[in-house]
């Protein structure tokens, strides 16, 4: 199994040829994890991810495997609440109250989005002038100022790191002389009989 230990932000990926690149569709929770095993879209194989901690992948970012293979990140549709208001002041007031509850919040010019929560919907209904609509949408909250979560040492993720390393080792040993690594490859190998679920993930707070 190939490992991606870096990625290119979507704003810097415009010059890349991604026409044949596989994709991987991830929820926000998955895009915030630095260590995991991914099932690529359309059954195009697996990829181990081991990027720098504290990063949040966004729709259109490009993971780069150790052999130079590109994998395009696609944000999954999620169950969110979209908040609109009659005036900018009322929208700002809604953002203030949601922020007081430490909610991950996506802030756009004319609306807010957060992970759907019926309790928060009821709270917003009491503000007046605010409408919250439940829908399925890409969710990309502003997490840049806070990083990817709070960590206390390496113990939380050691098991995941070790399992990922073991999976990569055994995948390589199963095909020790199948190809040369000198020139690199422009594709990701197909799956090796694993199930359709993602592997174990880091614990994020």
Curated annotation (Swiss-Prot):
Disulfide bonds: none annotated. This is Urease accessory protein UreE. The keyword Cytoplasm applies. SMART domains: UreE_N. It holds the Pfam family UreE_N. It comes from the Bacteria. GO terms for cellular component: cytoplasm. It is found in: Cytoplasm.
